[in-house]
From Swiss-Prot:
The keyword Cell wall biogenesis/degradation does not apply. Tubulin is the major constituent of microtubules, a cylinder consisting of laterally associated linear protofilaments composed of alpha- and beta-tubulin heterodimers. Microtubules grow by the addition of GTP-tubulin dimers to the microtubule end, where a stabilizing cap forms. Below the cap, tubulin dimers are in GDP-bound state, owing to GTPase activity of alpha-tubulin. Its main location: cytoplasm. Residues 429-447 have a biased composition (Acidic residues). This is Tubulin beta-5 chain. Keywords: Cytoplasm, Cytoskeleton, GTP-binding, Magnesium, Metal-binding, Microtubule, Nucleotide-binding. It comes from Ectocarpus variabilis (Brown alga). It is found in: Cytoplasm, Cytoskeleton. There are at least four genes coding for beta-tubulin in this organism.
Length: 447
């Protein structure tokens, strides 16, 4: 079986992760004690993707929970599905990273990382055919950002040929959780660009907007936001877990979605987003779903896809539907909005269909898009970074942990390069192939 080992790091990662396990367990009919109470063999057919079967028929998640302070772990353990996880897979320190990337990456995190890697090895060894790893974390904190990226680079060394995908919560434009977010996020991107295969970006503000506007929740909590996120994560992995007419796995996704190795930051969307009360009153059709999932209001990341162009995108449908209809809709979207898709990648929309819909819905779609509009996010973070770094504000917290200013400068220029790469491909047309190659050769000669 094609297994995925799931790692959750830091407070944000653990909260998203534990919500994700609630949704996954529910889809597979696993109760909080790990026993199966489902109603269909399909739930068990590929359950190995995320679960290990232990003695007595208990199902245990292939999850590793790590943090530099015990607080979040305790609340996960006390949560509804806390008894599901293997007790040895909780790895935590006592000191906390205090929102300091350097603590997570170089000092506190580096002391804990070996015990995390031991657990990762143990989980990887119990797999038949390990497909890859997924990490949930935030980019603005200390543990998820600093130690999460440290773990990625260590895992990459040890399992170079496995897919590494991350679900990264990026800092929001208006709502800031910590002042040093721009530093932590820029240092994280610096790592993710090199060491991850695909990053699904999420941000709280876009999630709040969805809760307010679409779901009509007046006071959304983090629980509501995480529920949205877990719906999307489950959508990206449904083909691995259930049979379908047209399957899609992490590797296929990476191959189809990443035209250039550095440009692997995706936006995700989910449809149908309806408020909990009005769900059962309307059935959605494939055209409606398609239209909704391409809608910028459904994106879980505060960048507007209309401000850029799609390099590639993938749409995963769930439920019983005709493949012909799906193909027609995909074609329709591209033809109607051709200006939003780069013309030098023909057929850049990939569709996959999984027969089993999520709990409580007849059909749903998950959208993953690699759009140049995501540069808006990086631009915003880079501006905030520069305005603080110019004054060397808060730097002493990082240099005190042994970091060098040079590393900040490198991360900053890497971020700016990323933005200009996105811009370059956004402006590119199919005609200018010749000019492109010359530029590249010049760059190589100069670099």
């Amino acid at each position: 079986m094609r297994e995925i080992v799931h790692v959750q790091a830091g407070q944000c990662g653990n909260q998203i992760g534990s919500k994700f396990w609630e949704v996954i367990s529910d889809e597979h009919g696993i109760d909080p004690t790990g026993s199966y109470h489902g109603d269909s063999d399909l739930q068990l057919e590929r359950i190995n993707c995320y679960f290990n079967e232990a003695t007595g028929g208990r199902y245990v998640p292939r999850a590793i929970l790590m943090d530099l302070e015990p607080g979040t772990m305790d609340s996960v353990r006390a949560g509804p599905f806390g008894q599901l996880f293997r007790p040895d897979n909780f790895v935590f320190g006592q000191t906390g990273a205090g929102n300091n990337w350097a603590k997570g990456h170089y000092t506190e995190g580096a002391e804990l990382i070996d015990s995390v890697l031991d657990v990762v090895r143990k989980e990887a060894e119990s797999c038949d055919a390990l497909q890859g790893f997924q990490l949930t974390h935030s980019m603005g904190g200390g543990t998820g950002a600093g130690m999460g990226t440290l773990l990625i680079s260590k895992v990459r060394e040890e399992y170079p040929d496995r897919v590494m995908s991350t679900y990264s919560v990026i800092p929001s434009p208006k709502v800031s959780d910590t002042v040093v977010e721009p530093y932590n996020a820029t240092l994280s991107v610096h790592q993710l660009v090199e060491n991850a295969d695909q990053c699904f970006t999420l941000d709280n503000e876009a999630l709040y907007d969805i809760c307010f506007r679409t779901l009509k929740l007046t006071t959304p909590t983090y629980g509501d936001l995480n529920h949205l996120v877990s719906a999307a994560i489950c959508g990206t992995t449904c083909s691995l877990r259930f049979p379908g007419q047209l399957n899609c796995d992490l590797r296929k996704l990476a191959v189809n979605m990443v035209p250039f190795p550095r440009l692997h930051f995706f936006m995700i969307g989910f449809a149908p987003l309806t408020s909990r009360g009005s769900q059962q009153y309307r059935a959605l059709t494939v055209p409606e779903l398609t239209q909704q999932c391409f809608d910028s209001k459904n994106m879980m990341c505060a960048a507007d896809p209309r401000h850029g162009r799609y390099l590639t995108c993938a749409v995963m449908f769930r439920g019983r539907m005709s493949t012909k209809e799906v193909d027609e809709q995909m074609l329709n979207v591209v033809n109607k909005n051709s200006s939003y898709f780069v013309e030098w990648i023909p057929n850049n929309v990939k569709a996959s269909i999984c027969d089993i819909p999520p709990k409580g819905l007849k059909m749903s779609t998950t959208f993953v898009g690699n759009t140049t509009a995501i540069q808006e996010v990086w631009k915003r973070v880079a501006e905030q970074f520069t305005s603080m770094f110019r004054r060397k504000a808060f730097l002493h917290w990082y240099t005190g942990e042994g970091m060098d200013e040079m590393e900040f400068t490198e991360a900053e220029s890497n971020m700016n390069d990323l933005v200009s790469e996105y811009q370059q491909y956004q402006d590119a047309t199919a005609e200018e192939e010749g000019e492109f190659d010359e530029d590249e050769e010049l760059d190589d000669a100069m670099g």
